[in-house]
């Protein structure tokens, strides 16, 4: 009896955990996009966020303010180290994507596109970013 219940419950629990991890990854990616856009607007310099599918991390970079009078630099510098958006092997992204945010809040993809997918092998979530930075996560 216990074996029958375990045979049913364990696969269901694994699928539920995979679903939670996919939702968490979508939330992390969405939050990183929105937060990076707000930083670009607040600081007044361009920012980028790069999502790497192989390492399941994202890296934020900016053209830092320097000089007198203060001005944005002409090249991007990473802010801190890469941050995981998911657990390696659990959730995949396609394609790797880099989004650039202008101080006006506009978004342009420099690698990939404004739409990419996250998948856990069972289900998929599509992240769509509008040109003005609105983020929508959809499940097909």
Located regions from the model:
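Membrane-proximal N-terminal amphipathic helix
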Residues: 15-47
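Type IV pilin-like appendage domain
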Residues: 46-103, 125-128, 136-140
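A short, compositionally biased
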Residues: 52-57, 108-114
């Amino acid at each position: 009896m216990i074996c029958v219940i375990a045979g049913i419950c364990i696969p269901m629990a694994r699928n539920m955990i995979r679903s939670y991890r996919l939702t968490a990854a979508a939330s992390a990616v969405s939050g990183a996009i929105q937060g990076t856009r707000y930083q670009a607007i607040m600081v007044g310099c361009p920012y980028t966020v790069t999502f790497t599918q192989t390492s399941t991390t994202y890296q934020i970079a900016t053209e830092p303010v320097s000089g007198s009078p203060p001005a944005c630099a002409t090249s991007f510098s990473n802010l801190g180290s890469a941050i995981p958006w998911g657990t390696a092997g659990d959730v995949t992204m396609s394609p790797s994507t880099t989004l650039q945010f202008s101080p006006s809040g506009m978004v342009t993809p420099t690698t990939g596109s404004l739409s990419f997918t996250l998948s856990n092998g069972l289900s998929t979530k599509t992240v769509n970013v509008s040109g003005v930075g609105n983020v929508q996560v959809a499940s097909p």
